[in-house]
Amino acid sequence: MAPLLELKNVSKAFGGLQVISNLDLHVNEHEIVSVIGPNGAGKTTLFNLVTGVYTPEEGDILFEGESIVGLPPNKITRRGIARTFQTLRLFLNMTVKENVMAAAYGHTRAGIVRSVLRTRGMRREEREISALAEEKLAFFGQRLAGYRHDQQAYSLSYANRRRLEIARAMATNARLLLLDEPAAGMNPHETHEITELIGKLRDEAGYSILVIEHDMHVVEGISDRVIALDHGLKIAEGSFDEVATHPLVVEAYLGVRAEAEEAV
């Protein structure tokens, strides 16, 4: 079976700076792949390439076997790829439920005229979106259920804002979730909960997931495979233990070779 997502020999540069170099990467159905690497490794650029924010100079990006290179971000989302961000992008003055409904509106058929006139079809779609939002929020249990539907997003804890960001991604009817540092800024208890949640997204909700994460405890706990980048190059791929102990990965994080040269 072909991978759900596949990058073939993808390269991206900004001026003279090569940010991604000849990258091959794939994510299979119902698989969690974590991407690690020091700052400047090219991780965020990778997400921007997959979601259509950037276009590669070379190579191809396939989703469900079809190229998505050149498609705008909204069409890539419609294809089934949704993304969360390291810096949360919620509508803080809207309620929890309204935030999720807003994410789902991209899949409605109603145009401006139908929306203004409040046609029967538009009202039916709103009921469907309302039910969809409640379904996605129910996945998070008491953290986002019940009375929290009517809470404004700014009143949520940081961890629950993270959950809401994921719920919004789920509401786009995605098959592939791109999670950008989902555990960033969380305490150990919250980090443990988000680790369990990511596994649940795969095991119970059936998502395939590509994750950028700096917390190695999270990476170890969720990953089917780990890919390490450094200056846009893939330097290791395999299980967590294989990648974490790979000499090039140790060097990228700790500068072992540089330290050894200084000691000579």
What are these regions (language model features)?
Residues A2-V264:
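Glycine-rich phosphate-binding loops of nucleotide-dependent enzymes
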